[in-house]
Amino acid sequence: MKVEDFDFDLPEELIAQTPLLDRTSSRLMVLDKESGDIKDQHFTDIISYLNEGDALVLNDTRVLPARLHGIKDETGAHIEVLLLKQKEGNAWETLVKPAKRIRKGATITFGDGALKATCLEELEHGGRILEFSYEGIFYEVLEQLGEMPLPPYIKEQLADQDRYQTVYAKENGSAAAPTAGLHFTEDLLEQISAKGVEIIFVTLHVGLGTFRPVDVEDTTNHKMHSEFYRLTEESAERINKIKAQGGKVVAVGTTSIRTLETIASRHDGKLVAESGWTEIFISPGYTFQAVDALITNFHLPKSTLIMLVSALSDRTKILAAYNHAVEEQYRFFSFGDAMFIH
């Protein structure tokens, strides 16, 4: 299919710049993936669509304050570093600006010297492999010195950085939030659990590639970025049991779908304990093996994520729903409203 087939007109004022005061006060568009019927509801209405014996699968990744500002030791030049992916030991794949100032062997100091980095390797497009040295625990040092790397379409400063974390975020490693999960509070999850819905966690560390534009004309030529995922034995067994008993598997976010479908596609539809790197690209024509329904936000035009949701329903129904969202003034993207496709 052509990437242009997934385009739609989005007024800039509908791109949410800040989160709502209350996480659960978002709106919820409910889309019947077969008929295309649309209902305009509130996010807390999601409870009525989840039944006893269903599974609600959430991604427990935690966003790192991955943007660092430092000084090149040799010259005093200001350097910005964005952590992308952990390699072996204390080495990270990073994006450096201005990259031309950091060549192999260059060193950078952050803060008062609590964190230092040495360039081990130069990559293309401003990428660098940096090895960090520090005292104590790396993630604690990062909390002190780093900033949250908000998406490029968010122009305003975030007053409370916790609002770019889910309430259940636990596993450090993401460069961006799994934003469908931002709508949940602990109280709402307790209400869902009390109804007999099983709350199950997976881990997928979201990379900045999630914001990268698709730069080919035909979707078949697109190569996805790789992201680390993990599914525990307990979670795999619980989901398999629910599916065997006829319960629905409802994924919260495209990252949860990508984790489950990566594993199911390798094991004849079954889920097993597994961790690794996935480059799965889900687009129309894909047959889902693990997931029945999806809670997600509204995505960018011509993005791999709108292609994914089009695979779960179909492109025409999704674009009709998106046009309805524009007409009804839904809020779009990371801090925007939600959609339930079932």
UniProtKB/Swiss-Prot annotation:
Top-level taxonomic group:
Bacteria
GO (cellular component) term, any one:
cytoplasm
Disulfide bonding pattern of the chain: none
Query: Any idea which UniProt keywords this protein has?
Result: Cytoplasm, Queuosine biosynthesis, S-adenosyl-L-methionine, Transferase
For the keyword S-adenosyl-L-methionine, the answer is yes
What's the EC number here? 2.4.99.17
The pathway it acts in is:
tRNA modification; tRNA-queuosine biosynthesis
InterPro entries noted in UniProt: QueA (IPR003699), QueA_dom1 (IPR042118), QueA_dom2 (IPR042119), QueA_sf (IPR036100)
Main localization is cytoplasm
Mind telling me which PANTHER family this protein's record contains? Answer: S-ADENOSYLMETHIONINE:TRNA RIBOSYLTRANSFERASE-ISOMERASE
Q: What assembly does the database describe for this protein?
A: Monomer.
What family does the entry list? Belongs to the QueA family.
Annotated HAMAP family? QueA
What is the protein's name according to its record? S-adenosylmethionine:tRNA ribosyltransferase-isomerase
